[in-house]
Curated annotation (Swiss-Prot):
The keyword Endoplasmic reticulum does not apply. It comes from the Eukaryota. Keywords: Chloroplast, Membrane, Photosynthesis, Photosystem II, Plastid, Reaction center, Thylakoid, Transmembrane, Transmembrane helix. It holds the Pfam family Ycf9. This is Photosystem II reaction center protein Z. Belongs to the PsbZ family. It is found in: Plastid, Chloroplast thylakoid membrane. It is a multi-pass membrane protein. May control the interaction of photosystem II (PSII) cores with the light-harvesting antenna, regulates electron flow through the 2 photosystem reaction centers. PSII is a light-driven water plastoquinone oxidoreductase, using light energy to abstract electrons from H(2)O, generating a proton gradient subsequently used for ATP formation. It comes from Porphyra purpurea. The gene is psbZ. The chain crosses the membrane at residues 8-28, 41-61.
Length: 62
């Protein structure tokens, strides 16, 4: 179970890093927001889901 938590945290850190770099680049590029809006919202939804799933799995370990 601890390995599952570690993998979830690794995914969360990876996705967070991608979003921290990607979102400002998309917002700074002219015309890119309209093209990438769905991708940014999908990434934010995945990030939120990962936070919730990680917290639920972590609560089962205690």
């Amino acid at each position: 179970m601890i390995i599952a938590i570690q993998l979830l945290v690794l995914l969360l850190i990876t996705l967070s890093t991608i979003l921290v770099v990607g979102v400002p680049v998309v917002l700074a590029s002219p015309g890119q927001w309209e093209q990438s809006k769905g991708l940014i919202y999908t990434g934010a939804g995945l990030w939120t889901g990962l936070v919730i799933v990680t917290s639920l799995v972590n609560s089962l370990v205690v």
